[in-house]
From Swiss-Prot:
This is Cytoplasmic envelopment protein 1. The keyword Aminoacyl-tRNA synthetase does not apply. GO terms for cellular component: host cell Golgi apparatus; viral tegument. Disulfide bonds: none annotated. InterPro entries: Herpes_UL7. HAMAP family: HSV_CEP1. Its main location: virion. It comes from Human herpesvirus 6B (strain Z29) (HHV-6 variant B). It comes from the Viruses. It is found in: Virion; Virion tegument; Host cytoplasm; Host Golgi apparatus. Keywords: Host cytoplasm, Host Golgi apparatus, Virion, Virion tegument. Pfam families: Herpes_UL7 (PF01677).
Length: 249
């Protein structure tokens, strides 16, 4: 029985090292109107006393207080996110068709202050221009937090992967402990950007400028579709939360 338990724990660990959750957005529902909202973060800083969130209204809060801020927001229902594999983000498109995408969209049941903070950090790492020193300090702080649940684990691993990816593509860090966490697809794209290898350019089928890389998935188009991630996520969220209301009423 013990060996079986260890095997299951190992399998769970492998799954969460392979998958990560991206495009974490707030679900807002007022009356019957459902919408997705971005986090109100404009910057993060890291000090000896913790991780600090700078908000759009000019206030600065400890990241562990973000739970209170979110729960006070009118109509806040929680978060949604998209589960993806390393190979599915090419930095040009998300290699999921609309049917696959629908099955990857999840309602995130986050409860603890640490989980709320990690959701905010995923957004910040995807969307904000963070300093190299901030990225270094961030991981040093995150490893101090207890990883006690599957949700915390996948959020932590996502943050870790995003930090390493940012350090590699924007700050040219190539240490082995960084590179092995950067998705191979993104490492290839970065090589293409730096060396302009025509074969890789054909593989990625890109016509955009190589000088601009964005980790946000919101504006990515889905495979074989003209729809963007944010458009389809909004459609599915409206259907899902409306159905839940009908079921509960």
């Amino acid at each position: 029985m013990k060996s079986l338990k260890k095997l299951k724990e190992l399998e769970t660990s492998d799954v969460f090292n392979t998958l990560h959750v991206r495009t974490i957005l707030k679900v807002i529902k007022i009356d019957k109107c459902v919408s997705l909202a971005r986090h109100s973060l404009v910057n993060i800083t890291v000090g000896d006393d913790g991780i600090w969130f700078h908000l759009e209204d000019g206030t600065m809060i400890n990241g562990l207080e973000y739970k209170t801020i979110c729960e006070k927001e009118l109509g806040f229902q929680g978060f949604i996110g998209i589960i993806i594999l390393d190979s599915e983000d090419t930095l040009q498109e998300l290699r999921l068709n609309p049917f696959q995408f629908k099955r990857r969209l999840i309602h995130m049941k986050v409860d603890t202050p640490e989980e709320f903070m990690l959701c905010g950090l995923v957004f910040a790492l995807e969307n904000l221009p963070l300093k190299q020193s901030t990225l270094h300090k961030l991981i040093a702080r995150l490893v101090l937090f207890p990883v006690l649940s599957p949700v915390t684990k996948i959020l932590f691993n996502t943050c870790d992967k995003l930090v390493c990816t940012l350090r590699h593509i924007f700050f040219n860090e190539h240490a082995s402990e960084i590179l092995h966490k950067v998705p191979p697809m993104i490492r290839l794209y970065n090589e293409m950007k730096n060396t302009h290898i025509e074969v890789l350019e054909l593989y990625f089928n890109t016509k955009r400028s190589h000088n601009f890389i964005n980790l946000s998935l919101e504006s990515r188009q889905l495979q074989d579709s003209s729809l963007q991630v944010i458009q389809l996520a909004t459609q599915f969220a409206q259907i899902f939360y409306s159905k839940n209301e009908d079921t509960s009423s």
